Amino acid sequence: MIDNKSYLISHPGSTLGSFVIPEDLSISDSMSLVECLLQYCKSKNIDNIRVTTPPNLYQYRLSNYIDFAFLKNNFYYLKRDVTSILYLENTIDETLKKFRPSHKRAIKKGIKKGLTCRLNTDIKSFYKILEQNLNIRHGVTPTHTLEELIELFKIFPEKIKLFSSFYKGEMVAGVVNFVVNEHVVLAFYISHNQEYNDLSPLNLLFFSMFEWAIKSNYKIYDFGIFTVDGVPNMGLGRFKENFGASGIFRDTFEIAL
């Protein structure tokens, strides 16, 4: 319930979600799907529907049919956030060419200072960094509890990957990645220990993750959104752009029934 009204939301605890559809979905079937959704919700006395669709580039075959069907059935854009997408080239050297000089320098500095990066399962150490960072920067707690995150890693060991930067044996930064499908990896949690800002640990960490992603045949790295309800965090957006990323929409549709 939101403001005493019932909502169908796909899903309120997830980054995004919509219909699970075949690659060759037709415009006719797209319209029918949305119409069936509306009929079902009305039959259950649901007041509102809210859907956050995956970015188009997650699809194997690009299509805006579902978006079109939503709009034709009087859904509206509740918000249009922007997520940062990096196309991964065939080699890490080719991908590195997209980096701006500041990020290249930061990577070299991290290596010179003795930073190392690796795939690991030390979720507790990462969570401590994440909690501290979110509290300092935003006064909030992580979406998942530590226990929930540990359980997710157990259930989906091939779909959730933690990469971390280490300095003198201590974890100083980490990124929890969700493997979305065969060609897309999404950064879900990004955090670092601010006491080690001078090492720029995230720069070398992302470089290492891109190298892993390329070797694993992924084609797109999604850094996640840098907007909150349409308001951009310019510093965060610039940080991602310096890796060669560009922005695409992550849309949320809504309708009142």
Question: What residues fall within each predicted segment?
Answer:
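Aromatic (often tryptophan-rich) hydrophobic motifs at membrane interfaces
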Residues: 11-14, 26-38, 150-257
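Residue-level detector of anion-binding/catalytic polar loops
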Residues: 47, 76, 116, 219, ...
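A gly/proline- and charged-residue-enriched helix-loop-helix capping module
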Residues: 11-60
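Gly/Ser/Thr-rich helix-start
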Residues: 18, 140, 225
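A conserved beta-strand-loop-helix scaffold within acyl/acetyltransferase catalytic domains
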Residues: 1-6, 53-196, 212, 229, ...
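A short, structural micro-pattern
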Residues: 13, 45, 78-80, 247
